[in-house]
């Protein structure tokens, strides 16, 4: 009997969510995890009895905030003294300490204080992606391509490779997320001649713009721009603050100091934000949110877009900068790809399309 052919998987190790795909029968299949979701939260939690990764880790974050680690991608390959690390630390409920100048997260695991490097946390997420792929393929997975942001430094790229090795993966290349997106859409196979592509990727924690040229299957990144602290989380924060104020106005209670209530509200806001773009409004229903008070509230899509209008506008300058740096005019873009969660928001799509003024550019959406 012939041994199964070894397959390499592709892993998008994201700041807030990760996913794994495999190329079969001429197309990329993004695989569902054990919860039936094609994206898995990049969360790792430690309890008195076990370690949780993904959906299970995120779902208990409200009850266990100090030992639930996320945003490891913001730490990986960086020094503890980096200004971005020092700034981010102020917003995390878990503790970050320095060891030899490198950041480590400190948690309580099985009753003991433990510290982990960001690569170790990321390796736990990568292991979850590996398990997801193995469950689907029915065979061991040893090889993986892992994507990183174009702006990642050599040390960040190497640390990501190290995370893959810790997870038991032989990392083939580390490739830029923008290049991976262009390949996924088959833009390298779209007719003869050189094509210019703009990737507009609003992820959970970062916003990245890349301009690529594709010629005879060869990809060249012409320019990159973006904001490493603009992403879906910022849109979530607007919703959380809006509903916190609504709760205070309606019930005269301030829940801003209650971490569990805030985490439950944030989870409900994330769910509301993912309401299909065909819907005109989303509803929050949270039983006993704070001091026994139930909270039921709706928000229209128009109101959401009004709350976030400045965030949508702030995506414009990075696009213009990327085009300037690539020495290209809007009219010279043949294709543009809307990635991350942006494609579900009509205003987000309108911002990108309006800025490029289409000019016959073909628009693609993330699956």
UniProtKB/Swiss-Prot annotation:
Task: Note the coiled coil stretches, chain numbering.
Answer: none
* Protein name (Swiss-Prot/TrEMBL): Putative heat shock 70 kDa protein 7
Instruction: Spell out the PROSITE patterns in the cross-references.
Output: HSP70_1 (PS00297), HSP70_2 (PS00329)
Instruction: List the lineage, top down.
Output: Eukaryota, Metazoa, Chordata, Craniata, Vertebrata
What's this protein's family per the entry? Belongs to the heat shock protein 70 family.
A Gene Ontology biological process in which this protein takes part is: protein refolding
Q: Which GO terms describe its molecular function?
A: ATP binding; ATP hydrolysis activity; ATP-dependent protein folding chaperone; heat shock protein binding; protein folding chaperone
The protein's superkingdom reads Eukaryota
**Species the sequence originates in:** Homo sapiens (Human)
Supply the alphabetized keyword list. ATP-binding, Nucleotide-binding, Stress response
